[in-house]
């Protein structure tokens, strides 16, 4: 099984891909692949280290569309797939979703799944570019084995508002987070924060 994400910067996709890699049954072997953070972005590789996950870094995969770097990234992903021979390729977010699924289709990977962590179908680009990205996602979704939405609202947007794919192809799986560290020393931490901001015990925050 191979997980492919845009890049290892702070955000939901890193946590999601890390947890899927770290906590999957020992019966399965998982390879995590992703691009590196861009200048000004916070690095999230410490999250992988915290859970004992090693990743294959893909410097060729950049945030913005670029014909030359995208072509290099696609070639590299294909090489990784051919060497690793995964039964499943699971991609996360737009850039990794496009390049990862294209590579998986070209390499005849049996199962190809994509998770939407957001989308760019409104408020990001002009009409022409938005139409193009929507068309690309529709074509990729047709060939994907399954699509994962992280909320019911997102599923509604993908299937009804923007018609990326049919409802039958989408499963809703909310992002999972490790909440244990927030449960530790809860009373002590609560008092510390309230003292810091001079809040009374009964004040609602």
Where are these regions (language model features)?
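Conserved donor-binding/catalytic core segment of Leloir-type glycosyltransferases
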Residues: 2, 200-205
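N-terminal strand-loop element at the rim of the active site
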Residues: 3-11, 15-69, 153-163, 169
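A short helix/loop element that forms part of the nucleotide-sugar donor recognition site in Leloir-type
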Residues: 43-47, 183-199
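A short, active-site helix/loop in glycosyltransferases that binds the activated sugar's phosphate group
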Residues: 142-172, 177-183
């Amino acid at each position: 099984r191979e997980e492919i994400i845009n890049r290892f910067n702070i955000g939901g996709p890193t946590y999601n891909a890390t947890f899927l890699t770290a906590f999957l049954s020992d019966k399965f072997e998982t390879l995590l692949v992703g691009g590196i953070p861009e200048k000004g972005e916070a690095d999230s590789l410490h999250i992988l280290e915290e859970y004992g996950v090693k990743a294959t870094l893909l410097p060729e995969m950049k945030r913005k569309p670029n014909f030359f770097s995208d072509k290099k990234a696609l070639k590299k992903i294909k090489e990784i797939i051919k060497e690793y021979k995964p039964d499943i390729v699971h991609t996360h977010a737009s850039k990794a979703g496009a390049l990862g699924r294209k590579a998986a289709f070209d390499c005849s990977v049996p199962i190809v799944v994509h998770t939407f962590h957001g989308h760019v179908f409104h408020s990001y680009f002009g009409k022409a570019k938005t139409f193009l990205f929507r068309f690309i996602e529709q074509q990729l979704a047709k060939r994907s084995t399954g699509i994962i939405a992280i909320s019911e609202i997102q599923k509604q947007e993908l299937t009804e508002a923007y018609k990326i794919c049919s409802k039958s192809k989408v499963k809703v799986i909310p992002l999972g987070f490790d909440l244990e560290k927030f449960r530790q020393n809860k009373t002590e931490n609560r008092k510390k924060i309230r003292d810091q901001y001079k809040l009374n015990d009964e004040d609602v925050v």
